[in-house]
A protein has these predicted regions:
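Beta-strand-rich interaction surfaces with strong enrichment in secreted/lumenal proteins
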Residues: 48-50, 78-82
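Cleavable N-terminal signal peptides
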Residues: 15-19, 28
Length: 118
């Protein structure tokens, strides 16, 4: 019986250490997040092209200055978010490989922009 208790305690200790390491790794990646401001005004994204480094998590701080709601969407980034008139939204994007990623306002399809990762 004492050997079983020792094994259980050893396993719990390993799980605790692994959990703490996972939490500290998550905190480090949150600090690495690149936040990019993006405004929707008069059915246009400003700027129309935003740049982010490869391999880093991205947060797009989208502010809708328009009089109507906008739907920020990107099929290639797998994100979709309705932003009410006068409101802001924080849109998280996974770390990306170099490329040019299109996004658009699904309510006004001519409104489009690009996230460029050099």
């Amino acid at each position: 019986m004492p050997a079983t208790r020792t094994n259980i305690l050893a396993t719990l200790g390993r799980v605790l250490i692994a959990s703490l390491l996972a939490l500290s790794a998550g905190a480090a990646s949150a600090e690495d997040t690149v936040t990019l401001p993006l405004t929707i005004k008069d059915h246009r994204f400003e700027p129309a092209e935003v740049h982010a480094p490869a391999g880093k998590p991205i947060a797009l701080q989208v502010k809708n200055l328009g009089a109507t709601a906008a739907e920020f969407e990107s099929t290639v980034l797998h994100v979709e978010k309705v932003v009410a008139a006068g409101a802001e939204a924080l849109i998280h994007v996974r770390p990306l490989e170099p490329g040019r990623y299109k996004f658009f306002d699904d309510f006004h399809r001519a409104t489009e922009g690009f996230l460029v990762v050099p």
